[in-house]
Amino acid sequence: EMCIRDRLWVALSYLLYAIANVITTGVMYYLFVFVLDEPAAFSITGIIPLIAGFIMAPLYPILNRWIPRRYLFTGGMVSMIIGYTMLALFSSNLPVVIVALIFFYVPAQFIQMTAILSLTDSIEYGQLKNGRRNEAVTLSVRPMLDKIGGAMSNGAVGAVALAAGMTGHATAADMTASNIATFKTFAFYVPLVLIILSLVVFWFKVKIDEKMHAQIVEELEAKLASGEIVDDEAQAVIKN
């Protein structure tokens, strides 16, 4: 039961993050065209996450040797919160927006890796409690959540553009203070709330961490060695 609860809380936390991330990423074009009036600079939104991915992906396991992933996840979320705050307050200042995008994109690998590892840890706990490893089901959760988040967010992106008047032949010069305020509300403030909720859910509801997982693995290995639990491969041989 705890395994299922933990998995669901991780899934909810990640889903909230995924929805916020996809919404904001999806409206970046409108930010550069209609708010900043700098469409030529839009390519920076592809360059920053590309470089961040190359650097942060190999850095995660190195940092995780000394820093628990709960804190790496928290640091990533705080970075995104800073990025959102800067985007909301200084959305018409290109240099500040670029710095904000660094805060926004850099922690993506940390957040995603933490979600994957947290889901993976629940596999051993499930095996310890019921004798079965549900790896395929568990590891398919994150891709499924990405698809759900993407589907939910795609409709939201179009709605944001429509509500803010960023459609048709409109230009940056046509944008009113009301249009910009509407855009920032749905592009930055609403996703910011989702990110904060994601952090709260993960921090207070997800229980399995590295220390607890190590204890689970130790207990599981002891039960496998004693024959109290039969691993899946052995069970398959017995059935055949």
What kind of feature is each model-predicted range?
Residues 1, 5-240:
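Membrane-embedded alpha-helical bundles of multi-pass transporters/translocases
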